[in-house]
Amino acid sequence: MVRDPKTEAALALHRFGLGPRLGSIAAIAADPRGALLSELDRPGIGRITDSDLLSSSQAARAAFDFRQERKAQRLADQELERQRQANASAPSTSSAAAMANAAPDGKDNTMDAKAASAAAQPQKPNVGPGIPQQIFLEEAKARINAALGADLGFVDRLVWFWSNHFCISADKGGGVRALAGAYERETIRPHVLGRFADMLLAVESHPAMLLYLDNARSIGPNSIAGINQHKGLNENLAREILELHTLGVRTVYTQEDVTNFAKVITGWTVVPFKQDAAHGGEFSFNPRLHEPGPQTVIGKPYPDLGLEQGRAVLADLACHPATAQHVAGKLARYFVADQPPQTLVERLTKSFLDTNGDLKELARALLTAPEAWTAARTKLKPPGEWIVAALRATGVTPPDIRPVIQAHNMLGAPLWRPPAPKGFSADSADWIDGLSERLDVANELARRVASLVDPQGVVDIALGPLATAETRQAIARAESRPQALALLLMASEFQRS
C-alpha cells in the first residue's frame, strides 16, 4: 500500500505515537518511520527527571507517617468520646447546676456553659488532606505532562505498554497508592529501551509489586519464621510472574512450578518502618523468611543461594521462548491490531530471542516491520491514549490534573488502578461500550477549550489527510464550536490507530 508522505506521517503519530500536535504531521512527513526510529536513540528519552517527585522510599515514608497520624487522630477521637460519655453519665446535680447557671437577669446560661466546656476540650490534631493522594496526583501530573510534551510519543507509548504489562494497583492499600508513580519511574522508564531481564528484575523486586501481590508477607513453611510463626506461603507473585509477566497463560509451567517458584522468592520483602526507620519501605531479602533448599522450576534445578536463587529463575524466564512469544503477541496487539498478522508476531518473537530481550531492538523491529504499517486502522484507542491525543490535538496542558484523572475514571481506565493483575485490556471490543462516556468527555473538553481553538484548524492538526470528506463536512456544519470539536474527537479517524 502506497501512501502520500503526510498520510504516512499522520498514521505514524496515531498508531505509534500519542497523536499529532501543532505542526507535527508536516515535521515528520519527509521520513515518518525514520523520525520514530530516531526517537529511540535520543539520550534520556522516556525518563521523568522532576526533582520535586519523591523516590519510592520517600513516598513510602510519607505514607507511613500519614497513617501513623491518622491512627493517632482516631485514638484521640476515641478518648474524647470516652470522656464525653463519662461526663454524660456522671451523677446529676441539676438544682445546683441550675442555680449556678442562673444569671442575674433570671436567664439560664447552661448553653453558654456547655459552649465554654466544649471550647476547653482538647482540639483534634490537624492531619490535613490525604498525603498518599497528594503524591499520586503529583505523579499523575508528571506523567501526563511528559506525554503532552513529547514530540512524537512512541517511547512514552512503550512506557505505558510495559507499565500495564507489569501493572500494580493504587487501590491495594498499604501505601501502594503513594508508590504508583515512583514504581513506573523507577522500574519501567529506566529500562524501557534496555533489556527485558533488567526490567523484570527491577519490577519484581520493587516494594510496590511486593506489596501489591502480597509477597512481602510470604513466608517459607520451613524457614525460621515459618516454623516459629506457623505462617505460610503466598503464591500470588510467583503465579503472575509466570502467567502474565513472562511465559503466558497455560504454557509450559505447572502448579508445582508456581509453588516451587513461590518458595524461591520467599524472603523478597519490604523493610517495615517500625523495625528499621532508616531503611523502611525499601526492598530487602530476609533470610529468616526464605524457604531453605533447592527448588525445581520449569524442569531446571536451582540451588539455594538465597537472593540469587530468585534472580537466577527470573533471568531464565526472561529469555525463555514462551516469554518471547507472549511479549511479541501483546506488543503487536497493543500497537497494530487486535488480531495482528502472524508474520508480525513471528518477526517480533525472533527479534526478542536473537537479541536476548533487547527492548530497543524489539521496538525497532516493530517500526521496521511492513505489517505494522499496512494493517488497516481498525483498532480503537484505549481511553488513556485517546484522552492524551485529544489534549495534544487541542494544545491544552491542564493546570489541574484532577479533571484528567476523572476522565480516566469515567472511561473505565482509572490511572494506575487496573481491575486485576492482568492490567487493562488492549482489545477494542472491551472499550466499545464506553463510547457514550467518551462523548461526555469530548463534550466537556470541547466546552472548556472551544474559545481557544479553531475546530477547522484542529482537524488539520489532528488528522490532516486522514480526515474524510464526511468528517470535514460534519465539522463545518456544526451548530457551535464546542459541537464541532466534539465531533472531531469522536470521529472514527481520530478514535482509531
Tell where the protein language model's regions lie, with residue ranges.
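N-terminal accessory alpha/beta regions
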Residues: 22-189, 216, 223
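Active-site substrate-binding loop specific to GH73 endo-beta-N-acetylglucosaminidase modules
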Residues: 101-109, 115-126, 139, 143, ...
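Short, compositionally biased low-complexity segments
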Residues: 7-15, 131-134, 157, 230-236, ...
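Flexible, low-complexity segments enriched for small/polar residues
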Residues: 2-6, 10-24, 50, 57-58, ...
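A general structural motif at alpha-helix termini
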Residues: 29, 40, 203, 366-367, ...
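A generic structural signal for nonpolar/aromatic side chains embedded in well-ordered alpha-helices
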Residues: 16, 28, 39-40, 188, ...
